[in-house]
Amino acid sequence: MLEKTLSILKPDVIKRNITGQVNSYIENSGLKIIIQKMCLLTRCQAEEFYAIHKSQHFFVPLIDFMVSGPIIVQVLQGENAISLYREIMGATDPKKASPGTIRADFAENIDANCVHGSDSLDNAMREIRFFFSDYELLALNG
């Protein structure tokens, strides 16, 4: 099934200047980057986006990391895009990620793990709308 999913290239990717390499993994998997933009999250935006993790011990360090520098948000499209992107991202902990995945090959540690990807169709729709306006999304269909 043709799907869209949200991808975030986290601050570590931009700081280390490996955006092109990460995008190559995405594109080589058959996924298409249909829209992307760079942004700098405010603390409030980061807390809203990751609200589901508010009670977790890693919430504050996650927010601190996500506001530490620019991110790139992308909408990816392809067959089974959600599960495919999660597969090429690799496990959250890069030590447990399979070789050849983004996190195994590029992530420095579990906190600076390079990428975020939606985990379900509902979350993909919600997360895409969090970062992209109706106008931006309409342009994709026009």
Swiss-Prot record:
Its cofactor is Mg(2+). It comes from the Bacteria. Keywords: ATP-binding, Cytoplasm, Kinase, Magnesium, Metal-binding, Nucleotide metabolism, Nucleotide-binding, Phosphoprotein, Transferase. Pfam families: NDK (PF00334). InterPro entries: NDK-like_dom (IPR034907), NDK-like_dom_sf (IPR036850), Nucleoside_diP_kinase (IPR001564), Nucleoside_diP_kinase_AS (IPR023005). GO terms for cellular component: cytoplasm. The keyword Kinase applies. It is found in: Cytoplasm. It is an enzyme of class 2 (transferase). The active site is at H116. One of its GO terms (biological process) is GTP biosynthetic process. The keyword DNA-binding does not apply. Gene3D superfamilies: Nucleoside diphosphate kinase-like domain (3.30.70.141). ATP binds at K10, F58, R86, T92, R103, N113. Its main location: cytoplasm. Major role in the synthesis of nucleoside triphosphates other than ATP. The ATP gamma phosphate is transferred to the NDP beta phosphate via a ping-pong mechanism, using a phosphorylated active-site intermediate. Homotetramer. Belongs to the NDK family. PANTHER family: NUCLEOSIDE DIPHOSPHATE KINASE, NUCLEOSIDE DIPHOSPHATE KINASE DDB_G0292928-RELATED. This is Nucleoside diphosphate kinase.
